[in-house]
Swiss-Prot record:
Function statement: Catalyzes the N-acylation of UDP-3-O-acylglucosamine using 3-hydroxyacyl-ACP as the acyl donor. Is involved in the biosynthesis of lipid A, a phosphorylated glycolipid that anchors the lipopolysaccharide to the outer membrane of the cell.
A GO biological-process term: lipid A biosynthetic process
Protein name listed in UniProt: UDP-3-O-acylglucosamine N-acyltransferase
Naturally occurring in which organism (per UniProt): Azorhizobium caulinodans (strain ATCC 43989 / DSM 5975 / JCM 20966 / LMG 6465 / NBRC 14845 / NCIMB 13405 / ORS 571)
EC number: 2.3.1.191
CDD domains per the UniProt record, alphabetical: LbH_LpxD (cd03352)
Reactions this protein catalyses: a UDP-3-O-[(3R)-3-hydroxyacyl]-alpha-D-glucosamine + a (3R)-hydroxyacyl-[ACP] = a UDP-2-N,3-O-bis[(3R)-3-hydroxyacyl]-alpha-D-glucosamine + holo-[ACP] + H(+)
Length: 357
Protein backbone atom coordinates (compact mmCIF):
# COMPACT_ATOMS: atom_id res chain seq x y z
CA UNK A 1 0.00 0.00 0.00
CA UNK A 2 1.29 3.46 -0.86
CA UNK A 3 1.18 6.38 1.57
CA UNK A 4 0.12 9.70 -0.04
CA UNK A 5 2.49 11.58 2.27
CA UNK A 6 5.39 9.77 0.60
CA UNK A 7 4.09 9.05 -2.91
CA UNK A 8 1.54 11.36 -4.58
CA UNK A 9 -1.74 9.80 -5.69
CA UNK A 10 -1.29 8.70 -9.31
CA UNK A 11 -3.48 9.41 -12.31
CA UNK A 12 -6.05 6.58 -12.51
CA UNK A 13 -5.61 3.97 -15.23
CA UNK A 14 -8.31 2.16 -17.19
CA UNK A 15 -8.05 -1.57 -17.76
CA UNK A 16 -7.19 -0.93 -21.41
CA UNK A 17 -4.35 1.35 -20.31
CA UNK A 18 -3.11 -1.28 -17.87
CA UNK A 19 -3.18 -3.89 -20.63
CA UNK A 20 -1.24 -1.62 -22.98
CA UNK A 21 1.37 -0.75 -20.35
CA UNK A 22 1.92 -4.33 -19.23
CA UNK A 23 1.48 -6.19 -22.49
CA UNK A 24 -1.18 -8.30 -20.77
CA UNK A 25 -4.46 -9.45 -22.32
CA UNK A 26 -7.87 -8.70 -20.85
CA UNK A 27 -9.40 -12.11 -20.15
CA UNK A 28 -12.96 -10.80 -19.77
CA UNK A 29 -13.39 -7.98 -22.32
CA UNK A 30 -16.28 -5.66 -21.53
CA UNK A 31 -16.38 -6.56 -17.83
CA UNK A 32 -15.55 -3.85 -15.31
CA UNK A 33 -15.17 -1.24 -18.08
CA UNK A 34 -15.79 1.56 -15.60
CA UNK A 35 -12.98 0.43 -13.30
CA UNK A 36 -10.19 2.94 -12.68
CA UNK A 37 -7.07 1.69 -10.92
CA UNK A 38 -5.31 4.12 -8.60
CA UNK A 39 -2.81 1.89 -6.85
CA UNK A 40 -1.28 -1.55 -6.38
CA UNK A 41 -1.11 -4.03 -3.54
CA UNK A 42 -0.54 -7.62 -2.56
CA UNK A 43 -3.17 -10.23 -3.35
CA UNK A 44 -4.20 -10.21 0.31
CA UNK A 45 -4.26 -6.43 0.78
CA UNK A 46 -5.24 -4.77 -2.52
CA UNK A 47 -8.55 -2.92 -2.48
CA UNK A 48 -11.30 -2.47 -5.12
CA UNK A 49 -9.41 0.27 -7.00
CA UNK A 50 -6.04 -1.47 -6.87
CA UNK A 51 -4.14 -3.98 -8.97
CA UNK A 52 -2.56 -7.21 -7.66
CA UNK A 53 -0.82 -10.15 -9.30
CA UNK A 54 -0.74 -13.93 -8.92
CA UNK A 55 2.06 -16.06 -10.30
CA UNK A 56 2.44 -18.96 -7.85
CA UNK A 57 0.03 -21.71 -6.83
CA UNK A 58 0.87 -21.21 -3.13
CA UNK A 59 -1.23 -18.02 -3.18
CA UNK A 60 -4.34 -19.54 -4.77
CA UNK A 61 -6.02 -19.87 -1.38
CA UNK A 62 -5.87 -16.08 -1.02
CA UNK A 63 -8.19 -15.62 -4.00
CA UNK A 64 -11.22 -16.54 -1.89
CA UNK A 65 -10.86 -13.37 0.18
CA UNK A 66 -9.23 -11.13 -2.44
CA UNK A 67 -10.79 -7.66 -2.86
CA UNK A 68 -8.55 -6.34 -5.66
CA UNK A 69 -10.16 -4.52 -8.55
CA UNK A 70 -7.98 -6.39 -11.04
CA UNK A 71 -5.41 -9.18 -10.99
CA UNK A 72 -2.63 -9.94 -13.46
CA UNK A 73 -1.98 -13.66 -13.64
CA UNK A 74 -0.95 -16.42 -16.02
CA UNK A 75 -3.23 -18.38 -18.32
CA UNK A 76 -2.89 -21.29 -15.89
CA UNK A 77 -4.57 -19.43 -13.01
CA UNK A 78 -6.91 -17.06 -14.87
CA UNK A 79 -9.93 -19.32 -14.42
CA UNK A 80 -9.45 -19.35 -10.64
CA UNK A 81 -10.01 -15.60 -10.23
CA UNK A 82 -13.50 -14.70 -8.90
CA UNK A 83 -15.91 -13.21 -11.46
CA UNK A 84 -16.12 -9.91 -9.59
CA UNK A 85 -12.42 -9.23 -10.23
CA UNK A 86 -11.05 -8.13 -13.61
CA UNK A 87 -8.40 -10.47 -15.01
CA UNK A 88 -5.39 -9.65 -17.15
CA UNK A 89 -3.35 -12.55 -18.53
CA UNK A 90 0.40 -12.40 -19.07
CA UNK A 91 3.11 -15.04 -19.52
CA UNK A 92 5.13 -13.06 -16.95
CA UNK A 93 2.66 -11.67 -14.39
CA UNK A 94 5.27 -10.21 -12.02
CA UNK A 95 7.02 -8.29 -14.81
CA UNK A 96 3.69 -7.01 -16.13
CA UNK A 97 2.72 -5.88 -12.63
CA UNK A 98 6.03 -4.03 -12.20
CA UNK A 99 5.52 -2.21 -15.52
CA UNK A 100 2.21 -0.82 -14.26
CA UNK A 101 3.64 0.05 -10.84
CA UNK A 102 6.45 2.02 -12.49
CA UNK A 103 3.88 4.06 -14.40
CA UNK A 104 1.78 4.76 -11.32
CA UNK A 105 4.66 5.59 -8.97
CA UNK A 106 7.65 6.94 -10.92
CA UNK A 107 8.86 8.80 -7.81
CA UNK A 108 9.60 5.45 -6.15
CA UNK A 109 12.23 4.58 -8.75
CA UNK A 110 14.95 6.75 -7.21
CA UNK A 111 15.56 8.88 -4.10
CA UNK A 112 13.74 12.20 -4.25
CA UNK A 113 15.09 15.64 -3.29
CA UNK A 114 14.11 16.90 0.15
CA UNK A 115 12.37 20.01 -1.18
CA UNK A 116 10.70 18.15 -4.05
CA UNK A 117 11.69 20.57 -6.81
CA UNK A 118 14.55 21.20 -9.23
CA UNK A 119 17.31 23.66 -8.43
CA UNK A 120 19.97 24.58 -5.93
CA UNK A 121 18.58 24.63 -2.39
CA UNK A 122 19.65 27.08 0.30
CA UNK A 123 22.53 25.65 2.29
CA UNK A 124 24.12 23.73 -0.58
CA UNK A 125 27.88 24.24 -0.99
CA UNK A 126 29.11 24.32 -4.60
CA UNK A 127 32.68 25.23 -5.49
CA UNK A 128 32.99 28.02 -8.08
CA UNK A 129 34.91 25.74 -10.45
CA UNK A 130 32.30 22.97 -10.37
CA UNK A 131 30.17 22.61 -13.50
CA UNK A 132 26.44 21.84 -13.28
CA UNK A 133 24.26 21.44 -16.35
CA UNK A 134 20.72 22.82 -16.47
CA UNK A 135 18.13 20.98 -14.40
CA UNK A 136 20.45 19.73 -11.67
CA UNK A 137 19.03 19.56 -8.13
CA UNK A 138 21.26 20.02 -5.08
CA UNK A 139 19.75 19.58 -1.60
CA UNK A 140 20.68 21.44 1.61
CA UNK A 141 24.03 20.49 3.09
CA UNK A 142 25.31 18.82 -0.08
CA UNK A 143 28.88 19.64 -1.10
CA UNK A 144 30.19 19.68 -4.68
CA UNK A 145 33.95 20.07 -4.86
CA UNK A 146 36.39 21.81 -7.20
CA UNK A 147 36.20 20.78 -10.84
CA UNK A 148 33.34 18.35 -10.31
CA UNK A 149 30.82 17.95 -13.12
CA UNK A 150 27.13 17.05 -12.77
CA UNK A 151 24.92 16.29 -15.78
CA UNK A 152 21.41 17.54 -16.50
CA UNK A 153 18.57 16.04 -14.48
CA UNK A 154 20.82 14.63 -11.78
CA UNK A 155 20.00 14.96 -8.08
CA UNK A 156 22.51 15.42 -5.27
CA UNK A 157 20.61 14.72 -2.04
CA UNK A 158 21.09 16.27 1.39
CA UNK A 159 24.57 16.09 2.96
CA UNK A 160 26.07 14.15 0.06
CA UNK A 161 29.69 14.98 -0.76
CA UNK A 162 30.84 14.98 -4.39
CA UNK A 163 34.63 15.22 -4.31
CA UNK A 164 37.01 17.20 -6.45
CA UNK A 165 37.07 16.19 -10.11
CA UNK A 166 34.23 13.67 -9.83
CA UNK A 167 32.12 13.45 -12.97
CA UNK A 168 28.44 12.47 -12.79
CA UNK A 169 26.35 11.85 -15.91
CA UNK A 170 22.77 12.81 -16.62
CA UNK A 171 19.65 11.76 -14.69
CA UNK A 172 21.69 10.17 -11.92
CA UNK A 173 20.84 10.34 -8.21
CA UNK A 174 23.32 10.56 -5.36
CA UNK A 175 21.46 9.78 -2.12
CA UNK A 176 21.57 11.50 1.25
CA UNK A 177 24.89 11.30 3.06
CA UNK A 178 26.76 9.61 0.21
CA UNK A 179 30.48 10.28 -0.16
CA UNK A 180 31.78 10.14 -3.71
CA UNK A 181 35.43 10.69 -4.62
CA UNK A 182 37.87 9.65 -7.35
CA UNK A 183 34.92 8.42 -9.40
CA UNK A 184 33.35 8.61 -12.84
CA UNK A 185 29.60 8.04 -12.73
CA UNK A 186 27.49 7.33 -15.81
CA UNK A 187 23.92 8.20 -16.75
CA UNK A 188 20.86 7.07 -14.76
CA UNK A 189 23.01 5.79 -11.91
CA UNK A 190 21.43 5.54 -8.44
CA UNK A 191 23.59 5.59 -5.30
CA UNK A 192 21.48 5.16 -2.17
CA UNK A 193 21.90 6.85 1.20
CA UNK A 194 25.13 6.44 3.09
CA UNK A 195 27.08 4.61 0.38
CA UNK A 196 30.81 5.24 0.19
CA UNK A 197 32.34 5.35 -3.27
CA UNK A 198 35.98 5.97 -4.16
CA UNK A 199 37.79 5.84 -0.83
CA UNK A 200 41.21 4.21 -0.89
CA UNK A 201 41.43 0.45 -1.00
CA UNK A 202 42.83 -1.71 1.79
CA UNK A 203 46.43 -2.02 0.66
CA UNK A 204 49.50 -2.48 2.88
CA UNK A 205 52.98 -3.90 2.31
CA UNK A 206 54.03 -5.89 5.40
CA UNK A 207 57.55 -5.44 6.69
CA UNK A 208 59.67 -5.81 9.82
CA UNK A 209 58.89 -2.23 10.80
CA UNK A 210 55.13 -2.55 10.37
CA UNK A 211 52.66 -2.25 7.51
CA UNK A 212 53.54 0.24 4.76
CA UNK A 213 50.46 1.88 3.26
CA UNK A 214 50.24 1.45 -0.53
CA UNK A 215 49.01 4.53 -2.45
CA UNK A 216 45.71 3.85 -4.22
CA UNK A 217 45.85 5.94 -7.41
CA UNK A 218 43.04 4.36 -9.44
CA UNK A 219 39.39 5.35 -9.77
CA UNK A 220 35.90 3.92 -9.41
CA UNK A 221 33.88 3.75 -12.62
CA UNK A 222 30.11 3.28 -12.32
CA UNK A 223 28.72 2.67 -15.80
CA UNK A 224 25.22 3.61 -16.99
CA UNK A 225 22.19 2.31 -15.06
CA UNK A 226 24.17 0.97 -12.11
CA UNK A 227 22.43 1.00 -8.71
CA UNK A 228 24.33 0.90 -5.42
CA UNK A 229 22.45 0.14 -2.19
CA UNK A 230 22.50 2.02 1.10
CA UNK A 231 25.62 1.64 3.18
CA UNK A 232 27.59 -0.18 0.49
CA UNK A 233 31.27 0.61 -0.09
CA UNK A 234 33.28 0.52 -3.30
CA UNK A 235 37.02 1.19 -3.01
CA UNK A 236 39.00 2.88 -5.75
CA UNK A 237 41.70 0.90 -7.50
CA UNK A 238 45.34 0.76 -6.55
CA UNK A 239 46.78 0.94 -10.08
CA UNK A 240 43.79 0.04 -12.25
CA UNK A 241 40.17 1.16 -11.93
CA UNK A 242 37.47 -0.53 -9.90
CA UNK A 243 34.68 -0.93 -12.47
CA UNK A 244 30.98 -1.67 -12.01
CA UNK A 245 29.47 -2.64 -15.35
CA UNK A 246 26.36 -1.30 -17.04
CA UNK A 247 23.05 -2.21 -15.40
CA UNK A 248 24.56 -3.99 -12.41
CA UNK A 249 22.48 -3.80 -9.21
CA UNK A 250 24.20 -3.86 -5.82
CA UNK A 251 22.17 -4.36 -2.63
CA UNK A 252 22.70 -2.65 0.74
CA UNK A 253 25.81 -3.33 2.85
CA UNK A 254 28.02 -4.78 0.14
CA UNK A 255 31.82 -4.37 0.21
CA UNK A 256 33.69 -4.21 -3.11
CA UNK A 257 37.45 -3.94 -2.78
CA UNK A 258 40.03 -2.23 -4.95
CA UNK A 259 40.66 -3.29 -8.56
CA UNK A 260 37.48 -5.39 -8.75
CA UNK A 261 35.89 -5.47 -12.20
CA UNK A 262 32.20 -6.40 -12.33
CA UNK A 263 30.49 -7.06 -15.66
CA UNK A 264 27.14 -5.93 -17.01
CA UNK A 265 23.77 -6.64 -15.38
CA UNK A 266 25.07 -8.51 -12.36
CA UNK A 267 23.07 -8.91 -9.13
CA UNK A 268 24.97 -8.70 -5.83
CA UNK A 269 22.90 -9.26 -2.69
CA UNK A 270 23.37 -7.75 0.78
CA UNK A 271 26.40 -8.46 3.00
CA UNK A 272 28.45 -9.85 0.14
CA UNK A 273 32.17 -9.09 0.18
CA UNK A 274 34.33 -9.18 -2.94
CA UNK A 275 38.08 -9.09 -2.35
CA UNK A 276 40.56 -7.15 -4.44
CA UNK A 277 41.37 -7.75 -8.11
CA UNK A 278 38.51 -10.20 -8.63
CA UNK A 279 36.65 -10.17 -11.95
CA UNK A 280 32.96 -11.00 -12.47
CA UNK A 281 31.57 -11.60 -15.94
CA UNK A 282 28.19 -10.40 -17.22
CA UNK A 283 24.88 -11.47 -15.57
CA UNK A 284 26.58 -13.02 -12.54
CA UNK A 285 24.38 -13.42 -9.43
CA UNK A 286 25.80 -13.52 -5.89
CA UNK A 287 23.41 -14.39 -3.04
CA UNK A 288 23.47 -12.76 0.37
CA UNK A 289 26.63 -13.03 2.49
CA UNK A 290 28.73 -14.51 -0.28
CA UNK A 291 32.47 -14.07 0.21
CA UNK A 292 34.81 -14.00 -2.79
CA UNK A 293 38.58 -14.19 -2.32
CA UNK A 294 40.87 -11.94 -4.32
CA UNK A 295 42.35 -12.46 -7.77
CA UNK A 296 39.76 -14.95 -9.03
CA UNK A 297 37.35 -14.88 -11.97
CA UNK A 298 33.64 -15.74 -11.95
CA UNK A 299 32.37 -16.47 -15.45
CA UNK A 300 29.39 -15.01 -17.29
CA UNK A 301 26.00 -16.08 -15.95
CA UNK A 302 27.34 -17.96 -12.94
CA UNK A 303 25.17 -18.06 -9.80
CA UNK A 304 26.55 -18.39 -6.27
CA UNK A 305 24.22 -19.47 -3.43
CA UNK A 306 23.86 -17.38 -0.28
CA UNK A 307 26.53 -17.68 2.44
CA UNK A 308 28.96 -19.40 0.09
CA UNK A 309 32.72 -18.84 0.08
CA UNK A 310 34.31 -18.63 -3.36
CA UNK A 311 38.01 -19.52 -3.18
CA UNK A 312 38.91 -19.84 -6.85
CA UNK A 313 37.76 -19.38 -10.42
CA UNK A 314 34.16 -20.26 -11.29
CA UNK A 315 33.23 -21.37 -14.85
CA UNK A 316 30.55 -19.52 -16.84
CA UNK A 317 26.90 -20.50 -16.51
CA UNK A 318 27.20 -22.72 -13.43
CA UNK A 319 25.43 -22.77 -10.06
CA UNK A 320 27.74 -23.15 -7.10
CA UNK A 321 27.24 -23.14 -3.33
CA UNK A 322 28.83 -24.07 -0.03
CA UNK A 323 32.10 -23.29 1.71
CA UNK A 324 34.29 -23.69 -0.14
CA UNK A 325 31.91 -23.19 -3.07
CA UNK A 326 31.48 -26.07 -5.48
CA UNK A 327 28.86 -27.21 -8.04
CA UNK A 328 25.42 -27.24 -6.41
CA UNK A 329 24.77 -30.93 -7.10
CA UNK A 330 28.05 -31.88 -5.43
CA UNK A 331 27.30 -29.57 -2.50
CA UNK A 332 23.83 -31.11 -2.04
CA UNK A 333 25.27 -34.64 -2.16
CA UNK A 334 27.77 -33.74 0.56
CA UNK A 335 25.07 -32.21 2.74
CA UNK A 336 22.82 -35.25 2.27
CA UNK A 337 25.68 -37.61 3.14
CA UNK A 338 26.50 -35.68 6.30
CA UNK A 339 22.85 -35.66 7.32
CA UNK A 340 22.53 -39.42 6.83
CA UNK A 341 25.75 -40.01 8.75
CA UNK A 342 24.53 -37.92 11.69
CA UNK A 343 21.16 -39.73 11.69
CA UNK A 344 22.91 -43.11 11.59
CA UNK A 345 25.13 -42.21 14.53
CA UNK A 346 22.13 -40.95 16.48
CA UNK A 347 20.26 -44.24 15.92
CA UNK A 348 23.29 -46.24 17.03
CA UNK A 349 23.72 -44.13 20.15
CA UNK A 350 27.20 -43.00 19.15
CA UNK A 351 28.22 -39.54 20.26
CA UNK A 352 28.30 -36.86 17.61
CA UNK A 353 31.59 -34.90 17.46
CA UNK A 354 31.28 -31.94 19.82
CA UNK A 355 28.81 -33.74 22.09
CA UNK A 356 31.31 -35.87 24.01
CA UNK A 357 31.37 -35.21 27.73
Amino acid sequence: MSEPAFFPLPTPLTLDEVAALSGARLARPGAQDALRLTGVGTLADAGPSELAFLDQSRYLATLGTARAGAIITSEKFAGEVPEAIAVLVSPRPASAFVAVTRQLFPQALRPQPVFGHTGIAPGAFIHPTASLEAGVTVDPGAVIGPGAEVGAGSVICANAVVGAGVRIGRDSTIGAGVSLSHALVGNRVIVHAGARIGQDGFGYQPGPGGHLKVPQIGRVVLQDDVEVGAGSTIDRGALRDTVIGEGTKIDNLVQIAHNVVIGRHCIIVSQTGISGSTTLGDFVMLGGQVGVVGHCTIGDGAQIAASSNVKGDVPPGVRWGGSPAKPVREWFREMTTLKKLAESRARSGAATPGEEE
